[in-house]
Amino acid sequence: MKWVKHGKESAGAEETARWMAAAVTAFAMTVMAVTLPGCGGPPTGVTPPEPPLKPPADTSMAPVGGAYHVHPGEDIQQALEAAATTGPKRVIVHAGTYAPRQPAQAMVWFNKHHDGITLEAEGEVILTAANPALADQSKRGYPAIVNHVVYFGDGISGKTTLRGFTITGANGFVTQDEKPVDIQPPIEAPKLEKGKFFYTDGGGIKIFGRSYPVIESVTVTDNFVSPCGAGISVEHRGYSDGSRLQSVQLRHCIFRNNRCPVSGSAVDLLHGSGAEIVNCLFIGNLSNEPMDDMAVTPGKWRPTHGSSALTLFPGSHVLVRRCTFTGNRNAIDDASSGNIYEQSIFWQNTAPGGWPPGGRYELDVASGIGVTGCFIRGEINDLRKSIDSERNVIGCDDPRFDAHFVPQAPGFESAGYRPVSGPAAVK
């Protein structure tokens, strides 16, 4: 199979065109997890315990109290199929750790058939890409056995919600095998053929095509992929106009300790993608990790200062409101214009290491006109000097974060992330 190049061809400068062209022409091999040597290294956090595995329950799963219920050792995907086929469109996953049942492209997947379902956690629920009992220790990505923990495919609207989970364990495993399951049936639309980034990016969550889910109160932590988008990869391929209807909604989420060699270690918005990110915390996410064979193409995006926790490629749209970025290896790089960053804190995103020769930055935005009410301080506050210092506090005082990263210093009352409990309150 040959990797396919996709992007918004009219967007971006010559640097972008050269970078994307290299991603296609230099990557002529087929990626199969069973044949590629090497690995990006084990996840940096605590490896979740090996969960008990049971044979799938019989297919006569029945709802109780207006929802399908899944307990440890049972099959989340089976409940999603039942909800999609007969309803009700609510699946509750009870406390425990859930791992993949077989090597595949994803552990849990949604496509058009599943639109309108709410999948939510009750108690502490960990979804992990790792299953040491089934993984081959000699292969790339061990102990992960799926490309993506959760996949949202073409045909998903804002009526579909993922809520309350911890998503972890991705480690650079890649397979193109569409058996035992094909997570994305053929799409009758231009520009939506599967390319390299469909398989490699989005270790925690991959969002592809005309897909605009709501992701709420989810912690995405300790994922590694190569080359890009360890936490969440959004690949709308131009099917986003920046409106709420055509944007992924990320609310009250935490992105922590996700790593990749190139761009968007926490969230990566590929060409022509869209997201609204409200009340989220980004901490300890590391782009620009050591380059490996998978990252040779596309190569080093932003070769002097590197990429960041949140990356936007040309033609992508974002609204970032009341978020906190701290301790990342750079905060935001945005190659588009007209994007909005409001009431957010960018504090000391100066994590050491990585391949870029240049200094660390807080914001590298092509247009700073949409940056308002933000508090910014790091090694380089405003890489392009595009941000209005009268509408933001550049070189701000220490926000004095508490253990939950809530600022305690005066003046920060309306800025940055705040923990929430229960259903989302901030819209």
Regions found by a protein language model. Name each.
Residues 1-19:
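N-terminal secretory signal peptides that target proteins for export/translocation
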Residues 37-38:
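C-terminal motif of bacterial Sec signal peptides marking the signal peptidase cleavage site
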Residues 45-66, 132-136, 140, 144, ...:
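Acidic, glycine- and Ser/Thr-rich low-complexity intrinsically disordered tracts
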Residues 60-94, 99-100, 109, 416-425:
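Acidic Gly/Asp/Thr-rich repetitive segments characteristic of extracellular carbohydrate-active
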Residues 77, 81-86, 99-118, 126-163, ...:
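Extracellular beta-strand-rich solenoid/capping regions of secreted or surface-exposed proteins
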Residues 93, 100, 110, 121, ...:
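Extracellular beta-strand solenoids
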Residues 107, 147-149, 173-174, 195, ...:
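Structural detector of coil-to-beta-strand junctions
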Residues 121-124, 159-171, 193, 211-226, ...:
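Right-handed parallel beta-helix
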